[in-house]
């Protein structure tokens, strides 16, 4: 089994300065045009998610109280931290 240490993962700051991403893995590896990616993000402020056309996202709240996801034309959803966290899937 392989373990990931967040303290050793490289950090990519978001262009809007509202958060940062720590990439765990992608397929194919080290490609910008990936088929899938697993990452951990830290969100510091309200802001827009970057667009990845055609890519489905699955969001699971790992810590914190709650997070509100809003889209003007698609959905509104509040993620709440639970003992067994729920996920939100969106494009």
UniProtKB/Swiss-Prot annotation:
Gene3D superfamilies: Jelly Rolls (2.60.120.10). Coiled coil: none annotated. It comes from Shigella dysenteriae serotype 1 (strain Sd197). InterPro entries: RmlC-like_jellyroll (IPR014710), RmlC_Cupin_sf (IPR011051), Uncharacterised_HutD/Ves (IPR010282). Belongs to the Ves family. The lineage of its organism: Bacteria, Pseudomonadati, Pseudomonadota, Gammaproteobacteria, Enterobacterales. It comes from the Bacteria. This is Putative protein Ves. Pfam families: HutD. Signal peptide: none annotated.
């Amino acid at each position: 089994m392989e373990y990931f240490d967040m303290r050793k993962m490289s950090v990519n700051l978001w262009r809007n300065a509202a958060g940062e991403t720590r990439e765990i893995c992608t397929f194919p590896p080290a490609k910008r045009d990936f088929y899938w990616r697993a990452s951990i993000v830290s969100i510091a402020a309200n802001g827009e998610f970057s667009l990845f056309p055609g890519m489905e996202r699955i969001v699971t709240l790992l810590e914190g109280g709650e997070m509100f996801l809003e889209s003007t034309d698609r959905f509104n959803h509040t993620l709440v931290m639970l003992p067994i966290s729920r996920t939100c899937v969106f494009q």
